[in-house]
Regions:
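N-terminal helical cap/lid subdomain that shapes the substrate entry/recognition surface
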Residues: 3-103
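Structural signature of beta-strand start/N-cap positions in the alpha/beta core
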Residues: 6, 117-119
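Conserved phosphate-coupling serine/threonine residues in phosphotransfer and NTP-handling enzymes
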Residues: 122
Length: 123
């Protein structure tokens, strides 16, 4: 039996991208009147409770972008941020599509890809 794996799978958030640093940098870049680290943490901390609402049937199956937006709206309220336009909220919500990789991610994945099939996933 060959014990060498053929496929390597990697979680996206926290493993191949720096979600926290990326969100905090965006919060700082757009000048939100909030601590960038606290805002990023609050936004991500809303994920499990929101998913629990989906799993329980309180919310129907929801696309992740819509779930992130639902959470964002709550975090903006929590931080008393009321000045953003709808377009600004949409752009901020899509920061999850612009997460930056860790410094060694690209080189590391390319090296692994030369010997294995690689895939990313996220729950």
């Amino acid at each position: 039996m060959n014990a060498t794996p053929k496929v390597l799978a990697f979680d996206v958030f926290g493993t191949v991208v720096d979600w926290h640093g990326s969100i905090a940098a965006e919060v700082k870049r757009i000048g939100l009147p909030a601590d960038p680290d606290a805002f990023a943490t609050a936004w991500r901390n809303g994920y499990r409770p929101a998913m629990a609402r989906v799993r329980s049937g309180e919310l129907p199956w929801t696309k992740i972008d819509d779930l992130h937006r639902l959470i964002l709206d709550g975090v903006l309220k929590e931080f008393d941020i009321t000045h953003l336009s709808e377009d600004q909220k949409k752009h901020l919500n899509l920061v999850w599509h612009r997460l930056l990789p860790w410094e060694d991610t690209i080189e590391g994945l390319l090296r692994l890809k030369s010997k294995f099939t690689i895939v990313t996933l996220s729950n």
